[in-house]
Amino acid sequence: MSQNASVGIVMPQKIPFEMPLVLENGKTLPRFDLMIETYGELNAEKNNAVLICHALSGNHHVAGRHSAEDKYTGWWDNMVGPGKPIDTERFFVVGLNNLGGCDGSSGPLSINPETGREYGADFPVVTVKDWVKSQAALADYLGIEQWAAIVGGSLGGMQALQWTISYPERVRHALVIASAPKLSTQNIAFNDVARQAILTDPDFNEGHYRSHNTVPARGLRIARMMGHITYLAEDGLGKKFGRDLRSNGYQYGFGVEFEVESYLRYQGDKFVGRFDANTYLLMTKALDYFDPAADFGDSLTRALQNVKAKFFVASFSTDWRFAPERSHELVKALIAAQKSVQYIEVKSAHGHDAFLMEDEAYMRAVAAYMNNVYKECQQ
C-alpha cells in the first residue's frame, strides 16, 4: 500500500442546483450550491463511485493539494489516493461541503436570493436528512444511480447511516467510522456549551456579525478549544504534554503557563481563521437532532429493516466522545435486523481523532473491506 502517493493538484467545483430543497423543518431553500472535489475516474458502468461525508469541521477537500505551494493536503489524504485504502485508481471518489458549511456550499456566508444579502443567522437549520437529500441530488447530477460505498467518520458516519435508510436502493456499502446512531446526553451538553460560548460573545450580533464588521472570535475559539479536548484521549494528551511548563516555573497569574494551554490556544486561533461561527452552530445542531430510530418507535432495528447495504463499522478504544459502545449499538441493531456487518475496534491512544490518523490496523481493515467492494464492481 503506497501511503506516499497522492491525487496531486485538485480543483474544487461549485455545482449549482436551480431547484427548491424542502428541509426537514418545513422551510425551503429556493436554490442551493454544493462545492465538491472528485478523484479518480467514473467507470463506464458508473458502479465505482464512493461518497466521502465530512465531520463537523470538514469540507470537500478530502485529498491532494490545491496548488504546488499548498502547505496542507486534504483532511483525509492518508485514506484517499492511489494505492491507499480508498484507492483512486479503482474508485471515483466524491467529497463535498455540506449545506450550511463555510467552504463554498450554500450556507450562512452565501447570498440569500430573496434579499440579495448574506444569509448569516437567517440560513435555516439543516439536518442529516437534509444533507442526504442534497447529496442524492448531487448523485443525480453526476449520473450515479447507486454508490459503491458511502464512507464517513463521526458526523460523516451518521450521514452514511442515514443514506442507507433514506435511499436503501442507492447504497451498496456503508462505512460508519467512529460514529453513533444518535448523540449521547453528554455530547448534546458539550454542543450546547460550545454554542453558548459563541452566542454570548459580544461580537456575535445575533448572527449578523459580518454586517457589523465583527467576528465572534472569542466564542468560536473557546468552542473549538473545548471540542478539541473531547477529540483527544486523556493518556495520549498526557504523554504529549504532561504538566510541562512553557517557562522554568509557575508565574502565579492567569496567562498561558502549561504547554497544553498553549496548544489549545493555537488550535482555537487556527480554527477562527478558517471557520464560520454560524456554520459551527448549524453543524452541532445537526449532530444533536440525528436520531433515525425516532421515526420507527425508537427502534434502531426497525429503522434498519429495509436497508440493503452491507456495513463496515469501526470504533477506537480510547474514543470517549463516540465510544466503542455506541458502535456496538449499531452493530447489534444491524444483526437483529439480519443485515451484513463487519466490525473492528482499533486499539489507539488518540481518542476520537484516531479516525483521521494513519494507524496500520485501521488502514488495513478499511483497505481489505474496500478491496471486496472493488471486486463487486468488477462482477
From Swiss-Prot:
Catalytic activity: L-homoserine + succinyl-CoA = O-succinyl-L-homoserine + CoA
Chief subcellular location: cytoplasm
Active site: S154 (nucleophile), D319, H352
GO biological process, one term: methionine biosynthetic process
UniProt site positions, description: Important for acyl-CoA specificity: R321
Stored Pfam families: Abhydrolase_1
EC code(s) of this entry: 2.3.1.46
Location(s) in or outside the cell: Cytoplasm
UniProt keyword Membrane present: no
Biological or metabolic pathway of the protein: Amino-acid biosynthesis; L-methionine biosynthesis via de novo pathway; O-succinyl-L-homoserine from L-homoserine: step 1/1
Subunit organization: Homodimer.
Function: Transfers a succinyl group from succinyl-CoA to L-homoserine, forming succinyl-L-homoserine.
NCBIfam families in the cross-refs: homoserO_Ac_trn, PRK00175.1
Family to which the UniProt record says this protein belongs: Belongs to the AB hydrolase superfamily. MetX family.
The name this protein goes by in its record: Homoserine O-succinyltransferase
Source organism per UniProt: Neisseria meningitidis serogroup B (strain ATCC BAA-335 / MC58)
Lineage: Bacteria, Pseudomonadati, Pseudomonadota, Betaproteobacteria, Neisseriales
Gene name of the record: metXS
